Amino acid sequence: MNKYASEHKEIPGNPSTAKSSSKKLNDRQNRSPLRVLTEKQWSFWVQKGYIVIKKAIPKKQAEATATFLWEFEEKNPKDVSTWYKPPRAEMQMKELAGTGMVEVYNNQYLWDNRQTQKVYDAFVDVWGTEKLWVTIDRANLNFPIKKGFEYKGFIHWDYDPETKPQNVQGVIALSDQTDINMGGFQCIPWLFQNYDLWKLGQPEDRNRFQPDISGIEKYIEKVAMEAGDLLIFNSLLPHGIRPNLSKDKVRIAQYISMMPAEED
């Protein structure tokens, strides 16, 4: 019997992470050497709750995946008039409508990225085990905001943080996202670090998945990435997709995660 325990049924973010692992994240007590992360990166990961692994997949591989996503959505990267047509598949999670989610999961391009050695090794580092399962996640084409296609972005958890979930999530950049105005990953490491203190000032009936960030907006970090980079983050880190405020740049990404395999 699978030992993963479902912490909640309705989540405001990624549905593939609705289950928390029964195994804990790597604390390095076994002193196994890191495969990808440096000691400096490890310290950053522990403190901030996220880390960017540069060139996790080859840039050409990222570009090929991006090209596939454009074709799958029947949109033309050089023709803005095609960008705002309805997506091929309706979003079941209405709070993600307008964020550019692409409902594709099992194409070979996506599997090539999931099976890239450096991607796997990075997840081995954060979990401390070689026996991992990969999640089957969607992708993202986040277009510039325009009238009728607004999206404010929201900070959330995919778990109730009170349950202290053991899980990580991740995203591979399929296009350069060095312009922080063009959308992409944002998070609040301060809240990751100070959650227990922060919650003392919050009402008991607060939304457990979408924190009130009034007064702590200044702590939001907007993470820049280049095509081929992998970002892994702790599920206790509040995060979200920032709105694309650029004129004509598209944020393209693939969601990915791995978790310890469970024996039957």
Q: Where do the model's predicted regions map?
A:
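Non-heme Fe(II)-dependent double-stranded beta-helix
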Residues: N2-Q47, K54-E162
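Double-stranded beta-helix
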Residues: E73, P77, Q177-R242, M259-D264
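Short acidic/polar capping segments at secondary-structure boundaries
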Residues: A139-K147, D160, L174-D179, W190-N194
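A short hydrophobic beta-strand segment most commonly corresponding to one strand
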Residues: G170, K249-E263
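Short beta-strand segments enriched in hydrophobic/aromatic residues
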Residues: L174, L237, M258-P260
